[in-house]
Regions:
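Aromatic- and carboxylate-enriched substrate-binding clefts and catalytic-loop regions
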Residues: 1-91
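Solvent-exposed beta-hairpin/edge-strand motifs
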Residues: 181-193
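Catalytic cores of secreted or luminal carbohydrate-active enzymes
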Residues: 100-136
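Edge strands and adjacent loops of beta-rich recognition modules
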Residues: 131-150
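Conserved small/polar residues in nucleotide/adenosyl-binding loops
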Residues: 197-202
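Carbohydrate-binding surface patches
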Residues: 145-183
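Conserved, mostly hydrophobic/aromatic
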Residues: 15, 103, 163
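Acidic/polar loop patches that form or flank catalytic/metal-binding clefts of enzymes
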Residues: 12-19, 42-47, 109-118, 137-139, ...
Length: 208
């Protein structure tokens, strides 16, 4: 992988490596090495029964070594929609997938679902189109590794903030403050919220 990054740098080609070994900070030496996987990503939430707490641990472990391409954006989480014989569902929710764009840093982000899925969930896909990929400021508002994490980030060069909060399999109420925001300003918020308390489907959500 290092050799590929070196040669790619000579030709001014960006690299996003998957199945790579653990990150060692060499993306600073080779800034064209934009991101890498180096941990279990979204596909394992479906095919390997990845536990929900996995992504609440990554910010304290894998992401210390550099940007991670987690390949988020799976909005159709129930497999029977595509194949009635498959009764399983991915260990995630639609809104949690959106939150990954904030909680799992990468300057190169994916929209990993099918185009027709994004047509069906157009308002959720709008968030993927709108969310920044680089940031001026980052605040960890609350966190407990293995349980939950809530992160607030300011879009680079813009007066736009994005907040992502994820949890394990247990629902919870986040207690956060916004005292880091400039005083005397008003903000308009678009909120994407799971309806896990009122609906059994992990794809149900509300955007307000």
């Amino acid at each position: 992988y290092i050799h590929v990054a070196q040669i790619a740098a000579q030709y001014k080609i960006m690299v996003n490596s998957h199945e790579a070994v653990r990150p060692t900070g060499l993306h600073r030496t080779y800034p064209n090495w934009l991101a890498q996987e180096s941990a279990r990503g979204t596909e394992f939430e479906a095919m390997a029964g990845l536990p929900p707490e996995h992504t609440t641990i990554l910010p304290f472990t894998r992401l210390i070594g550099g940007p991670m391409d987690y390949t988020p954006g799976i909005l159709q989480t129930i497999f029977s929609y595509h194949n009635p014989k498959k009764t399983k569902q991915a260990g995630t929710t639609l809104v949690k997938q959106l939150a990954y764009y904030v909680t799992i840093y990468s300057p190169l982000q994916m929209a990993a679902d099918l185009p027709e899925t994004y047509d069906r969930f157009a308002d959720a896909f709008q968030f993927i189109k709108d969310v920044a990929i680089d940031w001026d400021h980052t605040y960890i508002l609350e966190a407990e590794p293995g349980d939950y994490i809530t992160i607030s980030r300011k879009a680079k060069g813009k007066n736009e903030w994005f907040i992502g909060g994820i949890t394990d399999e247990n629902g919870r109420t986040a207690n956060i403050t916004f005292d880091y925001l400039p005083a005397g300003k008003q903000y308009i918020a678009t909120i994407y919220d799971c309806l896990l308390y009122t609906s059994p489907s992990p794809r149900d959500y509300a955007a307000s």
